[in-house]
From Swiss-Prot:
InterPro entries: Elong-fact-P_C, NA-bd_OB-fold, Rib_uL2_dom2, Transl_elong_fac_P/YeiP, Transl_elong_KOW-like, Transl_elong_P/YeiP_cen, Transl_elongation_fac_P, Translation_prot_SH3-like_sf. It is found in: Cytoplasm. This is Elongation factor P. Involved in peptide bond synthesis. Stimulates efficient translation and peptide-bond synthesis on native or reconstituted 70S ribosomes in vitro. Probably functions indirectly by altering the affinity of the ribosome for aminoacyl-tRNA, thus increasing their reactivity as acceptors for peptidyl transferase. Keywords: Cytoplasm, Elongation factor, Protein biosynthesis. Belongs to the elongation factor P family. Pathway: Protein biosynthesis; polypeptide chain elongation. The gene is efp. One of its GO terms (molecular function) is translation elongation factor activity. One of its GO terms (cellular component) is cytoplasm. GO terms for biological process: peptide biosynthetic process. The keyword Protein biosynthesis applies.
Amino acid sequence: MAERGSDIRPGHILEHNNALYLVVKVMHTQPGKGGAYIQAEMKNLKTGAKQYERFRTDGDIKRAIVDESDYQYIYGDGSMITVMHLKTYEQITISKDILGDKSIYLQDNIVITLVFYNGEIISAKVPDYVTLRVIETEAVIKGQTVSSSSYKVAMLENNQRISVPTFIKPGDKIVVYTPDDSYYERAKG
């Protein structure tokens, strides 16, 4: 679908130079001379290569028409995972690589979104927020207080290390913001 360059947003999938690109970051730039443009950081969905591209704000871009469907993770077998469509209960096996480095968030019954283009899976997304248990944390350095903005490193149940506030202790459940793999909050309940 044709749109203007000023309509580009992170998460959009564009058809550009005979390939599909996921828009990762967008910055609007108004130079002193000349017309405004959009500087977009994009990821080639086939090769995974990052690329920076400038689009005129009044220029045409072609947004890919994609379908998204939610699937529940059932189990993993090495480099492959089996997922089930939430409405039709159809089970399919796909490569874990489609999730990239976000495959560490796969856990029983998590719902992932598969993105289809012309009937073919082109990408997959985990939820933005995932709850995980803290397995171990670094010791708090004397002088650090709960009210200070200091952090310590924690190991999570998926063997991921992230920075957490000093009041988090082993056994706590925390919410992780998956787009940047950061601590979001202590899980409620």
